[in-house]
Amino acid sequence: MLQQPSPPLLTNSRLHIGFMPDSEGLNRQILESYLQLREQDFLRRSHFFGGRYENLYFDRERIPAIARVLEQAESYAQNLLQQANNLRSGFWINDMGSGESTTEHDHDEDDEMLSAVYYVQAPQDSGNLVIVDSHSRTLLTPQAGMFVFFAPSVVHSVSVNRSGERRISVGMNFGPMSKQ
């Protein structure tokens, strides 16, 4: 009997998870600064779905403690991409209230090489990160202090926040440093 080759396995090994050291106090500082922002502090907003803007952009100086998160994320990104000091990054806040969700999307819009999310506040039942591919869905329960890195082409969403509290995360994209 001739043995036919097996079809390729479908895997979902596209996620890389890390944790921010000493995140509890840091997240408290980020949250306190974020809650003091006013309308005029936001540079822009994007992705208006379900009555809210999913992405809120601001100068990093408005939340000084966020610098540590961005530095740690860049270190992880340099390691994952094997690109020392050749990366630029962009970031935004996603503030998801009770009953809200984030629509299915990807980050493959420009020259991004890696995307990430960092969880500042992720109460129990505040919505799972849903990673979608053509054959499966992977649910990841967020934790405050957790980073999740993935390719920009990975389609993902966030399920409904049923916690009664806000879920606050920082989205990030990493790309090549522009040549000038």
Show where each model-derived region lies.
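Double-stranded beta-helix
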Residues: 132, 172-180
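Residues at secondary-structure transition points
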Residues: 56-57, 122, 177
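Catalytic core of non-heme Fe(II) oxygenases with the double-stranded beta-helix
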Residues: 85-149, 153-159, 165-169
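Non-heme Fe(II)/2-oxoglutarate
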Residues: 1-84
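Short alpha-helical interface elements
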Residues: 55, 59, 167-173
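Residue-level marker of positions within ordered structural domains that often coincide
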Residues: 35, 121, 175
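A general structural signal for short secondary-structure boundary/capping elements
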Residues: 63-64, 159-166, 175-178
